[in-house]
Amino acid sequence: MIKKKTLKIETVHECDSCLGNKTLHPLATAIDLSKADCPECSFRFGFYTVLLTEGGCEDTSYGRKYDDYSGATMIFLPPGRAILADGNKPFPPAGRLLAFHPNLILGTTLGMNIHNYTFFSYFPDEALHLSLREKAKALECIDNITGELRHAIDRHSKILISRHIELLLDYCSRFYERQFITRNERNKQILEQTDRLLDEYIRTGKPDGRLSPSAEYCSRLLHLSPQYFNDLLKFETGKKIHEYFQLKQVETAGKMLLSKENDVSLIAEKLGFPDVQHFSRLFRKITGAAPEEYRITRN
């Protein structure tokens, strides 16, 4: 198989020129892909990219599940991430491409909060799959961005374009939360896998002074991006990975305390705590009782 070249695009103007689009603003563009002239190669953009595809939602590379909508699919790319060619072209025959340079959002609320839109760090197969109503709202937001781009550039342009983009991303945050809900059964399976993974982590003594496995460690074994794993765990349990792991540690400690042969200091050591005091504080915080008190009440 011949490996397709990757075209590095550093500016919005280069992006417009490459796809046959007129540049309306040097730091942002919204392109109708049905009218674009896409070269047969992969792209690596030096700016944020949002791709809404109206066709090809069956493509398994975007990770659509049986319980997902199929009105449209959206993927989000941070600066420097490549969008790979599928077949002959990297983009579908219909859809929209929104691109905005980091310089556009400097000093804006979007610039200060861009890290909260964690889906820019998701894998392509963790894409957002829209219902028809959600698709209409996303397209409406992109049309509003396009309308502002067509306005003559003035001192209000930067803030207004940024606000329109921020509104689109806020809707996408809502839609991702909805997708977590409709993927409830799939998410339960991932949580069960996470529980088994953490139980094995504890059983094999891997903590060894490390109080918590990282999101990178767990997500790699679950074949997820670290940020998607973090967001899924937070949505389903309300906990971050280190908080969830502490619950698992205390759960395991509670079982070990049922045996009088297990000394509290030995339990703390086996579970990877630096000392008994650290273990006892956490155990009391979660259960409301000190380890020895817990042992007495349970026996």
Model-derived regions, located:
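Generic protein-terminus/edge-of-domain signal
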Residues: 1-68
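Terminal helix-turn-helix DNA-binding modules in bacterial transcription factors
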Residues: 235-277, 296-299
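Conserved metal-binding segment of the jelly-roll/cupin
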Residues: 69-83, 99-102
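Append "Primarily bacterial transcriptional regulators
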Residues: 72, 217-224, 229, 233, ...
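…primarily DNA-binding HTH/wHTH and HhH modules…
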Residues: 280-299
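An amphipathic alpha-helical interaction segment
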Residues: 136-199
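A hydrophobic/aromatic-rich effector-binding and dimerization subdomain
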Residues: 88-153
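A short, Lys/Arg-enriched amphipathic alpha-helix from helix-turn-helix/homeodomain DNA-binding modules
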Residues: 162, 184-222, 243-262
